């Protein structure tokens, strides 16, 4: 999907509510620094100082919209950044620009970092000829999930289920609580109805067979070593060709290619949201006729 179109997924009311909550967190009371800057009309340039994928424009916009500032973008969402590059310009009262600066930079840097990691993962997987789905997980930051899931999609990865209502996933603890694999899947199928898929986490071929026989749509082969994963998936698919197989657990950018295979439909990586490094951006105020260029990071 075109990254530019992904912003249509984000409800304006949700964007405004998130932006307001982030600003409230950073400045719940008096902003003493505003007495230093004053409220004169000002402008600032957003610079990208590290390579990666630009993601998070809607959140950046929402933050400054709350502060009556205007953002003009020079690069579209999903652009590949080559530092140092001028990404956007923000205009508004000086004290409002600086009130939104850190919150907006944090959000953009984090979202872009996740998009960059996702794009790398997809590129690595595609280099093997594998055509399945690279996906994130539900291992996200509380209160920041929308940003992180959106970043995955800008980077070309699937966001997996957005929340508990997106799919019924039966994990080991659910099986223990239900009393058996079969009972857990039966209850999941009853809850899912016709509109939701049921996925079951399995740690052995025997569990995978039981899950598929009980009616699972997807079987997650969790924490399998690559040399065990592929024969297990092949055996499962031979018996249950309509069941999709997800590989998860221990997957990184370094070993991702080892998990790509004919019988694997989805590979999920928690590190895309848990370990992706943030990109480096800066927002610099400037006077008319004077646009400072920050130094790029050294790699």
Curated annotation (Swiss-Prot):
GO molecular function: identical protein binding; nicotinate-nucleotide diphosphorylase (carboxylating) activity
Residue(s) carrying Phosphothreonine: 291
Phosphoprotein in keyword set: yes
Pathway(s) this gene product operates in, as recorded in its UniProt entry: Cofactor biosynthesis; NAD(+) biosynthesis; nicotinate D-ribonucleotide from quinolinate: step 1/1
Chain positions recorded as quinolinate binding sites: 102, 138-139, 160-161, 171, 201, 222, 248-250, 270
Keyword check for Transferase: yes
Gene Ontology terms describing biological process: 'de novo' NAD biosynthetic process from L-tryptophan; quinolinate catabolic process
EC number: 2.4.2.19
Catalysed reaction, written as an equation: nicotinate beta-D-ribonucleotide + CO2 + diphosphate = quinolinate + 5-phospho-alpha-D-ribose 1-diphosphate + 2 H(+)
Keyword vocabulary terms for this entry: Glycosyltransferase, Phosphoprotein, Pyridine nucleotide biosynthesis, Transferase
UniProt region (Important for hexamer formation), positions on chain: 8-12
GO CC terms: catalytic complex; cytosol
NCBIfam families: nadC
Family listed: Belongs to the NadC/ModD family.
Subunit record text: Hexamer formed by 3 homodimers.
Function: Involved in the catabolism of quinolinic acid (QA).
Protein name, as recorded: Nicotinate-nucleotide pyrophosphorylase [carboxylating]
Higher taxonomy: Eukaryota, Metazoa, Chordata, Craniata, Vertebrata
């Amino acid at each position: 999907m075109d990254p530019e179109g992904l912003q249509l997924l984000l409800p304006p009311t949700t964007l405004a509510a998130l932006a307001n909550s982030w600003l409230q967190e950073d400045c719940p009371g008096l902003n003493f620094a505003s007495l230093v800057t004053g409220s004169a009309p000002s402008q600032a340039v957003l610079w990208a100082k590290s390579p990666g994928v630009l993601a998070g424009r809607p959140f950046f916009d929402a933050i400054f919209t709350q502060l009556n500032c205007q953002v003009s973008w020079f690069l579209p969402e999903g652009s590949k950044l080559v530092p140092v590059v001028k990404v956007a310009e923000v205009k508004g009262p000086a004290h409002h620009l600086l009130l939104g600066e850190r919150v907006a930079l944090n959000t953009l840097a984090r979202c872009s970092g996740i998009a960059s990691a996702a794009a790398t993962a997809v590129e690595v997987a595609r280099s093997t000829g594998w055509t399945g789905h690279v996906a994130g997980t539900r291992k996200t930051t509380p209160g920041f999930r929308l940003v992180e899931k959106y970043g995955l999609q800008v980077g070309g990865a699937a966001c997996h289920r957005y929340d508990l209502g997106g799919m019924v996933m039966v994990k080991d603890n659910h099986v223990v609580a239900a009393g058996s694999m079969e009972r857990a899947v039966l209850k999941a199928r009853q809850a899912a109805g016709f509109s939701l898929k049921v996925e079951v986490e399995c740690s052995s071929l025997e569990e995978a067979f039981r899950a598929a026989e009980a009616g699972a749509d997807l079987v997650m082969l969790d924490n399998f070593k690559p040399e065990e994963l592929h024969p297990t998936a092949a055996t499962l698919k031979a018996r249950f060709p309509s069941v999709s197989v997800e590989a998860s657990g221990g997957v990184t950018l370094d070993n991702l290619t080892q998990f790509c295979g004919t019988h694997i439909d989805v590979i999920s990586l928690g590190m895309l949201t848990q370990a992706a490094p943030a990109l480096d951006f800066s927002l610099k105020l400037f006077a008319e006729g004077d646009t400072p260029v920050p130094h790029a990071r050294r790699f």
